[in-house]
Amino acid sequence: MEKRKRTIRKLMPVSPYDSAGLEAWFSELAGQGLFVRKTGYYFANFQRKEPGSLVYKLEPCDQYRDEYEKELTEQYRLAGWEAAGDVWRKFIIFAAVR
């Protein structure tokens, strides 16, 4: 039996600035068992796990985000979300169970 890769790299179907498009794409792939971890300019890396029903939210941030990121991540955590990665260090990716 062939062993399946745990990390998958996919070409992003929309611009990294199309946050609604990326959120929908990430949610669709989570249903197939691929969970976003990191993105580059054109590609996104996913970790393979059991399929799940997640909703994603991209929150804009800037390159000087350390304090802001800590505060924002804590606010999202209290609301039931967890940080899942980032897009170009311009957006923080949050995920929550649908």
What are the residue ranges of the model-derived segments?
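Terminus-proximal functional modules
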Residues: M1-R98
